[in-house]
């Protein structure tokens, strides 16, 4: 319409007046309508092309994202789940494991996608005076596990609670009261659960579980027995020693684990009360008792506490005999900070019951311990203390002595400046821990200070699998096996032709 109107006006005016001539410079030519439309058309096509390309790319990304989410969801749905709650002495940790079944065999993958854990403090044994109090922490751990298990798999996923040394120290009636509360929580969790799946496990079983996961991680499970790796654990309430021994081991310390055509004769024992925390408490009590037997009040030097630390503990202890009705014993704990004396005191404590030994050899107390054979991994507090001091992997026991001497002999005020983020109760442990480790491994078990066959570790293998006994328990409970325990066979593990491993 506009174009036609323009033409009519032009015709009328041409009859009356000749149009003026317009002079323009070469650079100021006006574009005709036809020439102006060409670049406009090109710009329009370019814009359309860009829009189409962006939409195509966006749709492609959406499709890829949807495919990934769908495949991830399908993988999660295809997973099977197992949950283990580790009732340790210092805290309670839940482990959530995901695994697949391929050709009727479980495939384990301890990567981040298929493994999660959460730890809460304190441990179950802290509720000895209030068993009902354990309900809250166990419930929180259960909720954590439920969020990591596909809803459709919840009822088919087993959940187990395995309590260790902290609970073993309690009287049996108290243990049962705490376990009954946990069973009530687990029954209503929605997971597959049976009452017998909440229990206090033996220290020997704990050691075997740790041995299994270590050798699984190292790829030696299924190989020659003498090429496997032993485990020495230093927990809070107990210490475990487990390894293949060629010696004749008394039945109470012997475990036979069958793996296909390979049979492993294991020595496994848990030294209850000889974990790091329990041992330090035991040593302090011994110092107090020595002072109580000699005087009514006084100063008790503790060589395992760094110099300059001020701690006044009024220990109200009934005196024995005729002094019992005369008063109470009040002692002041004084930091002596001497590594050598702390080491000697720890060694004396480890050897206290040696006079009662009825075996050909007892390394710790009256407990039979064969000569250590093969390579070993020292875990838990062996690892934590070594990392704290920044020890090297070679000759770390020799380095531990030097580090312990420096730490124990340092003034407390200087240690606080050097380690400002550490709480007092945590920082105080390392003087005793360094001396205790040497007195246990070197002085008692006979490990040479330069022996490179024993290394401290928290993970093992190319994939850095955590050296947590709960992972070994998961492997044993998921697969099917024959585990000979003191002459009695029970189904726990059969890894040959049953489970294949993908880590």
UniProtKB/Swiss-Prot annotation:
Region (Disordered): 1-39
Glycan-carrying positions: 261, 293, 338
Amino acids binding ATP: 83-93, 230-240
GO cellular component: membrane
Pfam families reported in the protein's UniProt record: GDA1_CD39
Active site residues per record: 206 (proton acceptor)
The keyword Disulfide bond appears for this protein: no
Topological domain spans for side Cytoplasmic: 1-45
Record's bilayer topology term: Single-pass type II membrane protein
Transmembrane segments: 46-66
Gene Ontology molecular function terms on file: apyrase activity; ATP binding
Protein's name according to its UniProt entry: Probable apyrase 4
Protein EC: 3.6.1.5
Ranges per topology, Extracellular: 67-503
Annotated Low complexity bias: 1-14
Role noted for this protein: Catalyzes the hydrolysis of phosphoanhydride bonds of nucleoside tri- and di-phosphates.
Family as reported in the entry's similarity comment: Belongs to the GDA1/CD39 NTPase family.
Tissues expressing the protein: Expressed both in the primary root and lateral root but not in the rosette leaves.
Keywords (A to Z) from UniProt: ATP-binding, Calcium, Glycoprotein, Hydrolase, Membrane, Nucleotide-binding, Signal-anchor, Transmembrane, Transmembrane helix
Domain of life the protein comes from: Eukaryota
Subcellular location(s) per record: Membrane
Keyword Hydrolase: yes
């Amino acid at each position: 319409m506009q174009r036609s109107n323009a033409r009519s006006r032009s015709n009328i005016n041409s009859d009356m007046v000749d149009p003026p001539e317009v002079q323009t410079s070469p650079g100021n030519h006006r574009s005709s309508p036809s020439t102006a439309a060409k670049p406009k058309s090109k710009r329009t096509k370019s814009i359309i092309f860009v829009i189409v390309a962006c939409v195509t790319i966006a749709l492609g990304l959406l499709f890829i994202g949807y495919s990934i989410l769908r495949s991830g969801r399908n993988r999660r749905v295809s997973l099977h789940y197992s949950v283990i709650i580790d009732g340790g002495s210092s805290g309670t940790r839940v482990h959530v494991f995901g695994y697949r079944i391929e050709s009727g065999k479980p495939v384990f993958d301890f990567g981040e996608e298929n493994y999660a854990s959460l730890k809460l403090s304190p441990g179950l044994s802290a509720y000895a005076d209030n068993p009902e109090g354990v309900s809250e922490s166990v419930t929180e751990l259960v909720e954590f596990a439920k969020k990591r298990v596909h809803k459709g798999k919840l009822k088919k996923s087993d959940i187990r609670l395995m309590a260790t040394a902290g609970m073993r120290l309690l009287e049996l009636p108290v243990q049962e009261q705490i376990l009954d509360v946990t069973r009530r929580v687990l029954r209503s969790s929605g997971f597959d659960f049976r009452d017998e799946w909440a229990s206090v496990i033996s220290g020997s079983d704990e050691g075997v579980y740790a041995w299994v996961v270590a050798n699984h991680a190292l790829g030696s499970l299924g190989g020659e027995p003498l090429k496997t790796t032993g485990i020495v654990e230093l927990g809070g309430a107990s210490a475990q020693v487990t390894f293949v021994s060629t010696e004749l081991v008394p039945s109470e310390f012997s475990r036979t684990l069958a793996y296909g055509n390979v049979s492993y004769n294991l020595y496994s024992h848990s030294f209850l009360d000889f974990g790091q925390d329990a041992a330090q408490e035991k040593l302090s009590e011994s110092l107090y008792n020595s002072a109580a037997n000699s005087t009514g009040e006084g100063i008790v030097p503790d060589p395992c506490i760094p110099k300059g630390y001020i701690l006044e503990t009024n220990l109200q202890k009934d005196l024995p005999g005729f002094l019992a009705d005369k008063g109470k014993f009040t002692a002041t704990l004084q930091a002596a900070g001497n590594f050598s004396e702390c080491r000697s005191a720890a060694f004396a404590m480890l050897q206290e019951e040696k006079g009662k030994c009825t075996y050909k050899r007892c390394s710790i107390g009256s407990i039979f311990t064969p000569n250590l054979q093969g390579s070993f991994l020292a875990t838990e507090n062996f690892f934590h203390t070594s990392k704290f001091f920044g020890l090297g992997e070679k000759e770390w026991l020799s380095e531990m002595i030097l580090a312990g001497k420096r730490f124990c002999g340092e003034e407390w005020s200087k240690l606080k400046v050097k380690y400002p983020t550490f709480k007092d109760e945590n920082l105080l442990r390392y003087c005793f821990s360094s001396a205790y480790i040497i007195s246990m491994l070197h002085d008692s078990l006979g490990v040479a200070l330069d022996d490179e066959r024993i290394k401290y570790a928290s993970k093992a293998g190319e994939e850095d699998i955590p050296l947590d006994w709960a992972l070994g328990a998961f492997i044993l409970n998921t697969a099917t096996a024959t585990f000979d325990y003191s002459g009695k066979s029970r189904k726990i593990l059969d890894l040959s032709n049953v489970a294949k491993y993908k880590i």
